[in-house]
A protein has these predicted regions:
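Mixed-charge, Lys/Arg-rich low-complexity intrinsically disordered regions
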Residues: 1-19
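Intrinsically disordered, low-complexity, charged/polar segments
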Residues: 2-6, 51-77
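Short beta-strand-centered aromatic/proline hotspots
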Residues: 29-43
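A short, compositionally biased micro-patch
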Residues: 26-27, 48, 58
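Primarily hydrophobic membrane-targeting regions of prokaryotic envelope proteins
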Residues: 19-24, 36, 54-55
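Short, solvent-exposed secondary-structure boundary/capping segments
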Residues: 41-52
Length: 77
């Protein structure tokens, strides 16, 4: 699979962290699939997060948002 060049804002992220990747979130002790990576402003708190990572459990479920530095690659199956 040939991937498209990363947007400039994403170029400082580790190469394994991209949309569609399976990752592990130690804060929730869960594996998830990366749905989107981008800048995000929480509408409730007005706090801004650069390169927020939107995750969803494999197989579906409720999405959550984490900072990229909080994640690691998921173990191989």
């Amino acid at each position: 699979m040939i991937s498209a060049p990363r947007p400039a804002a994403h170029q400082k992220l580790p190469p394994w962290l991209q949309e569609g990747a399976r990752v592990f979130d130690p804060g929730r002790e869960r594996e998830a699939i990366v749905q989107f990576i981008g800048d995000y402003e929480d509408p409730a708190t007005r706090r801004f997060m650069k390169n927020a990572v939107f995750l969803r459990p494999e197989g579906g479920g409720r999405e959550w948002i984490v900072a990229p530095e909080a994640l690691r690659p998921a173990d191989a199956r």
